[in-house]
């Protein structure tokens, strides 16, 4: 193997192994990512993402951006975030919008509670689009969703997908929120490649069982939009049996 072949192989390996928290993708996603790496200069590409505490700030996504050399890093993730909206979730940028909070400790503060109810994927995506439209960030070439572990109301993928009008989808379920966000990014940025990272395992067997149900629903939503799924649950190296 010559140096050029080693270089190409290493780039492929970086994409598959290091891209998206070092977790492996479905075969379809791996093939697509490998093909992209060989042809594309990442220094001319822009990376966007949304998620919860695992993604918020400069964590795995910043590592991906730095290693692969993306031009920009646009991250709207917030700790404690969910896919599902609340019945009183506000529209980002609306007249009465009070902001977003990743707080999780008990509180009676009504404004703080409203901010927490705004900490959902739909509002994050509205914020992301607004920041692109106002010139704060460029149009993304890659966008990764990585959330779901905090959702409790899963819903059914079939219910979320059967509604033809996007704004009529029930966004108070994880399934509905995921469909709205994925479809919105795809339609707003048609040249952007979208990926979804599944929730990872934890030290709780019951929580892991619930996550598997969520993953099945998210996978069905992604299949409907031809969005590759990154299997972080199976490949993250974390298992309940290893927790002490």
Residues covered by each model-derived region:
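Short, Lys/Arg-enriched N-terminal segments with co-localized hydrophobic residues
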Residues: 1-9
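Conserved SGNH/GDSL esterase-like catalytic core that processes O-acyl groups on lipids
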Residues: 43-49, 54-168, 172
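Catalytic His-Asp segment of secreted/periplasmic serine-dependent ester chemistry enzymes
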Residues: 199-244
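Active-site segments of SGNH/GDSL-like serine hydrolases
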Residues: 146-153, 179-215
């Amino acid at each position: 193997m010559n140096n050029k072949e080693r270089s190409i192989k290493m780039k492929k390996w970086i994409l598959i192994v290091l891209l998206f928290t070092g977790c492996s993708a479905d075969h379809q996603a791996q093939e697509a990512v490998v093909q992209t790496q060989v042809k594309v200069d990442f220094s001319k590409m822009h990376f966007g993402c949304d998620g919860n505490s695992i993604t918020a700030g400069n964590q795995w996504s910043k590592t991906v951006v730095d290693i692969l050399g993306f031009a920009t890093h646009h991250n709207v993730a917030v700790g404690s975030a969910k896919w599902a909206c609340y019945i009183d979730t506000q529209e980002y940028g609306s007249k009465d919008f009070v902001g977003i909070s990743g707080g999780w400790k008990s509180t009676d503060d009504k404004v703080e509670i409203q901010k927490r109810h705004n900490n959902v994927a739909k509002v994050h995506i509205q914020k992301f689009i607004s920041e692109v439209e106002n010139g704060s960030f460029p149009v993304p070439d890659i966008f990764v969703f990585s959330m779901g572990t905090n959702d409790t109301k899963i819903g059914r993928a079939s219910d979320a997908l059967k509604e033809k009008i996007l704004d009529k989808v029930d966004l108070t379920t994880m399934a509905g929120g995921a469909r709205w966000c994925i479809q919105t990014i795809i339609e707003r940025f048609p040249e952007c490649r979208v990926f979804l990272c599944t929730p990872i395992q934890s030290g709780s067997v019951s929580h892991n069982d619930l996550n598997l149900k969520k993953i099945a629903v998210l996978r069905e939503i992604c299949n409907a939009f031809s969005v590759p799924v990154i299997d972080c649950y199976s490949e993250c190296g974390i298992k309940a049996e290893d927790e002490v």
